[in-house]
Amino acid sequence: ITGIYTNLEYDDGNGMQMIFLDTPGIHKPKNKLGAAINETALNTAGGVDVVLLIVDGTKKFGKGDQYILDMLSQSETKKVLAINKMDLIGPEAYLELYNKYDESGLFDEIFGISALQDTNVDRLMKCLSNYMIEGPMYYPEDMATDHPERFIVSEIIREKLLQYLDQEVPHGVFVEIESYDEKPRITE
């Protein structure tokens, strides 16, 4: 999924546009599909200005996280880490996670954020903009993604299925929406 962030006030009104490529999650593959997903994520990491890894601050660092770090170490691209959900954890838990990721030596910068509370998100975006190579704006200023809303809804449903059914459902889940009633937006 491509996410598009446009800030027309950036750089004294010259504006900027960041394009985020949400890759499939890196994980220890159990089959060919899993290996292909990892390969896609790593190939994407090699063709961008900066890699942003967002981790859930409420979860302990585990073997899967170490596997992700090992895979990311194969890319020479600059890397920034965002430890999300700072509003739900205490300073000790944050420091423990921060130190664990910092020990890897992979990250050029590490941020504690709360996407929900909008804590440090501006600082993170400013940091990311420092790694961007100047270029044209590829998308209209009001565009937030290159996918239709129906696709986004199916991806949210798929994500929730995988989240709540955990080991019961393979990663090869496909969601087909048979009926969809698009209503005017209340919020963006």
What are these regions (language model features)?
Residues I1-T2, P29:
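Conserved substrate/cofactor phosphate-moiety recognition/catalytic segment
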Residues I26-G34:
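Flexible beta-alpha connector loops of hexameric P-loop NTPases
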Residues T77-V80, M86-F151:
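Canonical P-loop GTPase G-domain recognition
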Residues D142-E188:
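Long, well-ordered amphipathic alpha-helical subdomains in the mid-to-C-terminal portions
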